[in-house]
Amino acid sequence: MSSPVIHILNGDALGDQFPKDLPGETLVFRECLIEGPRKEVEFEAFFTSRAAYLSDTYDPTIKESYSQELSIPLMKVVTDLKPSEVVLWFEEDLFCQANFWFVCHFLLSSGYRGKVSWAKPSGTARYNFGLLSKESLMAVFEDRLPVDIAKITLLWQASSVNDSDELIRLVEGITDLSEYIIPAALAYRDMNTSTIEQSRPYLSLLEITKTQKTTHFGKAFMAFCKKEAVYGFGDIQVKRIFDKVVAHEN
């Protein structure tokens, strides 16, 4: 069975606001590939390790739902649906970029040879689809950018082995898209330091707690999201780092 277009969305929030008038089917990519196991020999084992990690780290029910809601539908894109185009709806922050790089890697490695494009928000919405109306999302679709998944695959491969220098070098070589990806690549480098105390997220939270004279997580989280929007972290990711900052200072 062939489907003309498959839209792979970056999360449930976008799924809720996604324009119904756009042609094709949708798949929500519920992952967090900035953390946890990222090296894979083959995809079945990789997805199994991801389901176990997310279940242990976030929600025990994920282990049961992961295959039905993510890995099996993703496999069907390349084995059954075989669309003429896959549209990737991902923002420019690192959280989304890591997922974007992996999906491109998956498509290439699975033998997909159709068209791939990137429907990305821009301007003040570059890190947040939620700022856009349905009409604006339609415009994002119309302005989608062509993607060479062979080049983006290399970004996943470099990041999955924590080679920040190679990641940045590769991004700089993708001249048509580098301006949109380089901030996330630099943020990745600044996060993957030899100790967490040297990392940019840690140092930013340390500065926030000192300048605002607060150990209140809610306030620190809001300030971090504003200062370091390029990371796209959720509250759980920030809370882990925040707790280390507070513990170190006490």
Q: What kind of region is each of these model predictions?
A:
Residues 58-101:
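Long, hydrophobic/aromatic-enriched structural stretches that serve as scaffold segments
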Residues 1-63, 69:
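A structured, charge-rich N-terminal accessory region that forms the first stable segment of a protein
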Residues 16-20, 38-39, 96-104, 127-131:
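A short acidic (Asp/Glu
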Residues 203-204, 225-250:
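Charge-enriched amphipathic alpha-helical scaffolds
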Residues 119-137:
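Short, conserved secondary-structure transition motifs
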Residues 213-224:
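Short acidic, hydrophobic short linear motifs in intrinsically disordered regions
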Residues 131-211:
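A conserved mid-domain beta-alpha-beta active-site/ligand-binding segment of alpha/beta enzyme cores
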Residues 102-116:
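A short alpha->loop->secondary-structure connector
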